[in-house]
Amino acid sequence: MAAATASAAATPAKKAAPKKPAAAPEHPSYKEMLTKAITELKERNGSSRQAIKKFIQSNFKVKDNFDVQFNQALRRGVEKGEFVQPKGPSGTVKLAKKEKAAAAPKKPAAKKAAAPKKDAAPKKAAAPKKAAAPKSAAAKKKLLDAKKAAAKKPAAKKAAAPKKVAAPVEKPAPVKTTTTKSGRVTKASTTSKPAPKKKAAAPKKAATPAKSS
């Protein structure tokens, strides 16, 4: 027994073999490969699954289980809101629009120290308005009666045109009667005859000179 234990102690314990460093992955994560494929293809309505797979296989070294890993990565990305399939699970794939980062809250501008307010000049007391003399009920009644009386008065008649004054008729002058010696009555003419116009005097002839003998 003692010999066995001594031999065991004599043999040094075997060192654990150093671990081999893990092989570096030959491609980035499937999420990154999907994102790069969609970005590079630049299709407006999204890229089809076949186009994305073809891009990944031609640019990265993938293993045999590529299809399984591709489908799982796509499903997880849709659930997390990283990818969008507008036409359903078998349709095209698009990148989800990133929401704009919330704008940083603006710092409130430091308020300037308010200048001390000047004491407002005391306003002059407004002069009390004269109370309007209340109209008595009697005055109101008189006004109403006057309005009614004015409404009842008929419109004034037009002034009658002045009558034309007849021109006075001239009476004939009384006829004067005269008696002649023989007793006959004669009527004197009342109308005065116009005085006969005097003939213009004929011009005097110039005296002829006497002939000399």
From Swiss-Prot:
Residues 1-30, 81-213 are annotated as: Disordered. GO terms for biological process: chromosome condensation; negative regulation of DNA recombination; nucleosome assembly. Keywords: Chromosome, DNA-binding, Nucleus. GO terms for molecular function: double-stranded DNA binding; nucleosomal DNA binding; structural constituent of chromatin. The keyword Disulfide bond does not apply. Residues 1-25, 102-113, 123-137, 157-176, 203-213 have a biased composition (Low complexity). Pfam families: Linker_histone (PF00538). The keyword Nucleus applies. Transmembrane segments: none annotated. One of its GO terms (cellular component) is nucleus. It is found in: Nucleus; Chromosome. InterPro entries: H1/H5, Histone_H1/H5_H15, WH-like_DNA-bd_sf, WH_DNA-bd_sf. Residues 26-97 form the H15 domain. Belongs to the histone H1/H5 family. Could act as an H1-type linker histone. This is Histone H1.
